[in-house]
Regions:
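Non-ligating segments of multi-cofactor redox enzymes
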Residues: 1-238, 243-244
């Protein structure tokens, strides 16, 4: 039976498998003309981080390539057109967190939801994280966030224990927040801490496409509320304008 949920899971798994293979290949073959692109050249956040330096001095941050800026512009453009589909359909960290939560529920671990007031407060943290990252990156002229970035850690898993010992904090975030906390609170990283999600959440407010509830056919079953990976309650709204909406389509 065709459902958008199955299509989405297929797309998520495909992108996660591909980008994980790219990370493995980079660790085994190395970079350079004969190798595989670096982790940083494939990260849209790096494009946002490098904008200030490029505009003021014409130079890229170390490790960042023009591809990062191209990716960020593309993702930002898609967000303005159809919402945060990058977060809901493509982002590897989002997929890891969501798949881990699905596995946890299959094993009988109950999904948890924080009290609404606490949830709203914590959702503001990612904007502070974004502001801090941009401030120190633009001030220092280097990728200040890199040592704490779970995306970098995921792409370096093939490097083994030596990499984990040399740069442990990113792995702490990966294993304890993206995966660990994500077992109980679905997409915990995405909801509360992701800096790229914060940037795209701002753009989401201006998106031309919004998720809408059709009152004439809605039977008030609350399925959309229960299935939303980001803890939004679409049934209480006619049009979902929440910055955290990732167009997951799990209600269908």
């Amino acid at each position: 039976m065709f459902t958008w949920k199955r299509v989405r899971y297929g797309v998520m798994f495909g992108f996660l498998a591909y980008i994980s293979w790219v990370g493995y290949q980079h660790q085994t073959l190395g970079g350079g003309p004969e190798g595989i692109p670096t982790v940083d050249s494939l990260c849209p956040l790096g494009g946002l981080e490098s904008i200030y330096g490029y505009l003021t001095s014409g130079a890229w941050l170390r490790r960042v390539a023009p591809s990062s800026l191209i990716l960020f512009i593309a993702v930002a453009g898609i967000t303005l057109l159809v919402g945060r589909v990058f977060c809901g359909w493509i982002c590897p960290l989002g997929s890891i967190g969501e798949f881990c939560n699905l596995a946890a529920r299959k094993l009988g671990i109950r999904r948890r939801e924080l009290p609404p007031a606490l949830d709203r407060a914590l959702k503001m943290v990612k904007y502070a994280v974004l502001a801090v990252i941009l401030y120190f990156t633009w001030t220092w002229g280097t990728l200040a966030w890199r040592s704490y970035d779970p995306w970098v850690s995921w792409m370096h898993l093939a490097s083994g224990w030596e990499e984990m010992v040399a740069s442990p904090w990113g792995y702490v975030v990966l294993f304890f927040v993206v995966i660990g906390a994500g077992l109980f609170i679905e997409r915990c990283w995405c909801r509360y801490l992701c800096p790229l999600g914060a940037a795209l959440g701002i753009l989401q407010k201006f998106s031309l496409t919004k998720v809408r509830r059709t009152k004439e056919t809605c039977i008030s079953c609350s399925k959309c509320d229960r299935s939303c990976a980001m803890g939004i309650t679409p049934m209480a709204l006619e049009e979902v304008t929440d910055a955290d909406c990732i167009a997951g389509g799990r209600r269908t």
